[in-house]
């Protein structure tokens, strides 16, 4: 009998849906006993992919431990000491809480990366996706509010006194969280476990004719859009880009531009640079999130 052709996409049976496909990472996790009969091409690529997934998981766990510790300490300090409850620190507190939402979801993402599928079900998929999106938008909106607060403190120091108060900062923070949740409603509605149709997985060798068929099901936590999917996906990308990046970026740049215009005639160049030194930092944080 002739050896099986290892060319991807070559049909191994007359049935139209039975196609050969090399999936070494999935075999390594779900069907390790089949690696002995896989092709040389597959066995050579498995250690690399397995090591890559393991390294990514280690990085995720490291970020989880360090981030959880640091953000928890920041939250504790602001809540524990009354003198720390300033307007700026209240916004920083909300940034730390938003980061904790993302950090708590890292073990789930690391597990999906190692196993190459989502094993936690639909509910946790929606929770993790929502927490991740809430982190992004809440952090961005908090940075924007902090820029507005800086603008009020520098340009309108007297008139803004009644607005720059911890009680007002708490109300603004609550509004930021509410707006963020409204913004991420598409994620809450459309995130789910995506299940690809089961199909036979066929493995052969060049030395002998050997075929084993295994039913493969690949689950991933993702956004599942209604038809037409391309239109929904593109609209969501544009929507998040405008609301979560370009809009806040415009407000932040405008605030610091007005600050520069206000103080440039009253301060030296070095002092002006000190006042606006946090603007590039805010923009970098905005682009990172």
UniProtKB/Swiss-Prot annotation:
Q: Which UniProt keywords apply?
A: Cell membrane, Disulfide bond, G-protein coupled receptor, Glycoprotein, Membrane, Receptor, Transducer, Transmembrane, Transmembrane helix
Name used for this protein in its record:
Somatostatin-like receptor F_48D10.1
In the record, what terms sit under GO molecular function?
neuropeptide binding; somatostatin receptor activity
The record's subcellular locations are: Cell membrane
Look up and give the membrane topology term.
Multi-pass membrane protein
An example GO CC term for this entry is: neuron projection
GO aspect biological process, one term: cellular response to glucocorticoid stimulus
Q: Which residue spans traverse the membrane?
A: 58-79, 90-110, 127-148, 171-191, 241-261
One family name in Pfam for this protein = 7tm_1
Q: Which Gene3D superfamilies match?
A: Rhodopsin 7-helix transmembrane proteins
Which residue ranges does the entry give as Cytoplasmic-facing topology? 80-89, 149-170, 262-289
Q: Which residues are glycosylated?
A: 40
Instruction: Spell out the disulfide connections.
Output: 125-221
Could you list which ranges are Extracellular topological domains? 1-57, 111-126, 192-240
Protein family: Belongs to the G-protein coupled receptor 1 family.
């Amino acid at each position: 009998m002739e050896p099986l052709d290892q060319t991807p996409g070559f049909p191994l049976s007359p049935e139209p849906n039975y196609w050969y496909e090399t999936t070494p990472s999935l075999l390594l996790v779900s069907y390790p006993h089949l690696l002995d009969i896989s092709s040389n091409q597959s066995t050579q690529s498995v250690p690399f992919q397995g090591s890559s997934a393991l390294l990514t998981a280690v990085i995720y766990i490291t970020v989880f431990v360090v981030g959880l510790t640091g953000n928890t300490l920041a939250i504790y300090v602001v809540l524990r000491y009354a003198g720390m409850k300033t307007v700026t620190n209240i916004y920083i507190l909300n940034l730390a809480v938003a980061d904790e939402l993302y950090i708590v979801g890292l073990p789930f993402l690391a597990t999906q990366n190692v196993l190459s599928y989502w094993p936690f079900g639909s509910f946790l998929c929606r929770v993790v996706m929502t927490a991740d999106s809430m982190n992004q938008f809440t952090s961005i909106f908090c940075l924007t509010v902090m820029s507005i607060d800086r603008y009020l403190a520098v340009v309108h120091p007297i008139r803004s006194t009644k607005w720059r108060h911890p009680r007002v900062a708490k109300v603004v923070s609550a509004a930021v969280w509410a707006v963020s949740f409204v913004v991420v409603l598409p994620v809450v509605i459309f995130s789910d476990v995506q299940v690809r149709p089961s199909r036979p997985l066929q493995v052969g060798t060049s030395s002998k004719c050997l075929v084993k068929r295994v039913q493969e099901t690949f689950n991933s936590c993702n956004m599942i859009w209604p038809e037409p999917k391309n239109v929904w996906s593109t609209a969501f990308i544009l929507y998040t880009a405008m609301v979560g990046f370009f809009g806040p970026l415009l407000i932040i740049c405008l605030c610091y531009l007005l600050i520069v215009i206000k103080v440039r005639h009253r301060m030296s160049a070095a002092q002006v640079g000190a006042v606006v030194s946090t603007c590039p930092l805010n923009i970098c944080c905005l682009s990172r999130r």
